[in-house]
């Protein structure tokens, strides 16, 4: 997909377009479509309508919309579409702690829960070099639970910025999600908002923010991967909000 440069300069504009389907989802869409067609050919109309709904949902699940990523070195961008369910200070995961990872000091963790209706393409929150990529097999408990960070199947990423600051994020499988797929490898040079992985069928992403980072999101806020600014590097005023 070609890059689209957006601007807020007078006279600039962009046309809406249908989101493409990620290649990983095309086989599922094809299978669902074939089953739907078979039901209709056999005269099983009720099942045909049900499978048509499933086919449309599969297409929506694997949609891969274009996102316009803010270009600023101090911004940390949401890696996932979803709902902010937790903002807490916690130790970094042991698999990516220590001097070659995120260190051992407590970090601010922002958790984003993705429902089965959200886009499930995940993106890197900052530009830099992928220093660690660690897959951990595990359980499939509800991804909205706190223990999912330690018990569920998960994939850890540690990205080091050009200034040496390291940021971690973790894809976590859930009750329905049974497959985590990274698109990148150790040592990859990543751009902010670049597609880095996919979790199939509902899950969560945790972001581990370094010291001196100010969160710019609130509990209950929705995010868009590659677009929503969730934090800024450096001290600044925190924000409050009202649910209404």
Curated annotation (Swiss-Prot):
Pathway-wise, it operates in: Phospholipid metabolism; phosphatidylethanolamine biosynthesis; phosphatidylethanolamine from CDP-diacylglycerol: step 2/2
Bilayer topology term: Peripheral membrane protein
Q: Which biological processes are named by the entry's GO terms?
A: phosphatidylethanolamine biosynthetic process
**Which EC class, in a word?**
lyase
The cross-references to InterPro entries, in alphabetical order and at most eight, read: PS_Dcarbxylase (IPR003817), PSD-A (IPR033175)
Q: Which cofactor does it need?
A: pyruvate
Q: Where is this site: Cleavage (non-hydrolytic)?
A: 202-203
The entry's comment on post-translational modification says: Is synthesized initially as an inactive proenzyme. Formation of the active enzyme involves a self-maturation process in which the active site pyruvoyl group is generated from an internal serine residue via an autocatalytic post-translational modification. Two non-identical subunits are generated from the proenzyme in this reaction, and the pyruvate is formed at the N-terminus of the alpha chain, which is derived from the carboxyl end of the proenzyme.
Reading the lineage from the top rank, the first entry is: Bacteria
Documented EC number(s): 4.1.1.65
Q: Which GO terms describe its molecular function?
A: phosphatidylserine decarboxylase activity
Naming one, the record's GO cellular component terms include: plasma membrane
* Entry annotation: catalytic residues: 203
Residues bearing Pyruvic acid (Ser) are 203
Report the principal subcellular site: membrane
Record's keyword terms, sorted: Cell membrane, Decarboxylase, Lipid biosynthesis, Lipid metabolism, Lyase, Membrane, Phospholipid biosynthesis, Phospholipid metabolism, Pyruvate, Zymogen
The residues forming a coiled coil are none
Q: Which reaction does it catalyse?
A: a 1,2-diacyl-sn-glycero-3-phospho-L-serine + H(+) = a 1,2-diacyl-sn-glycero-3-phosphoethanolamine + CO2
Spell out the PANTHER family in the cross-references: ARCHAETIDYLSERINE DECARBOXYLASE PROENZYME-RELATED (PTHR35809:SF1)
Q: Which family does it belong to?
A: Belongs to the phosphatidylserine decarboxylase family. PSD-A subfamily.
Q: Which NCBIfam families has this protein been placed in?
A: PRK05305.1-2 (NF003678), PRK05305.1-3 (NF003679)
Q: How does it assemble?
A: Heterodimer of a large membrane-associated beta subunit and a small pyruvoyl-containing alpha subunit.
Designated name of the protein? Phosphatidylserine decarboxylase proenzyme
Query: In the record, what lineage is assigned to the organism producing the protein?
Result: Bacteria, Pseudomonadati, Pseudomonadota, Alphaproteobacteria, Sphingomonadales
């Amino acid at each position: 997909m070609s890059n689209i440069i957006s601007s807020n300069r007078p006279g600039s504009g962009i046309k809406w377009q249908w989101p493409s389907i990620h290649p990983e989802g095309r086989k599922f869409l094809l299978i669902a479509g074939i089953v739907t067609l078979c039901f209709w050919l056999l005269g099983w109309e009720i099942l045909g309508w049900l499978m048509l709904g499933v086919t449309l949902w599969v297409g929506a699940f694997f949609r891969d919309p274009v996102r316009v990523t803010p270009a600023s070195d101090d911004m940390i961008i949401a890696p996932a579409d979803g709902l902010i369910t937790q903002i807490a200070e916690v130790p970094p995961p042991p698999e990516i702690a220590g001097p070659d990872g995120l260190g051992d000091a407590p970090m601010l963790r922002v958790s984003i829960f993705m429902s089965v209706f959200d886009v499930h393409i995940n993106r890197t929150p900052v530009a830099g070099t992928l220093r660690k990529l660690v897959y951990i097999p595990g359980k499939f408990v509800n991804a909205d639970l706190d223990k999912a960070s330690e018990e569920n199947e998960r994939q850890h990423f540690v990205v080091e910025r050009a200034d040496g600051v390291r940021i971690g994020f973790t894809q976590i499988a859930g009750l329905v999600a049974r497959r985590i797929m990274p698109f990148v490898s150790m040592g990859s040079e990543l751009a902010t908002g670049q597609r880095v992985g996919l979790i199939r069928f509902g899950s969560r992403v945790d972001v581990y923010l370094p010291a001196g980072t100010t969160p710019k999101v609130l509990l209950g806020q929705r995010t868009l991967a590659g677009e929503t600014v969730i934090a800024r590097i450096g001290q600044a005023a925190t924000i409050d909000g009202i649910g209404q």
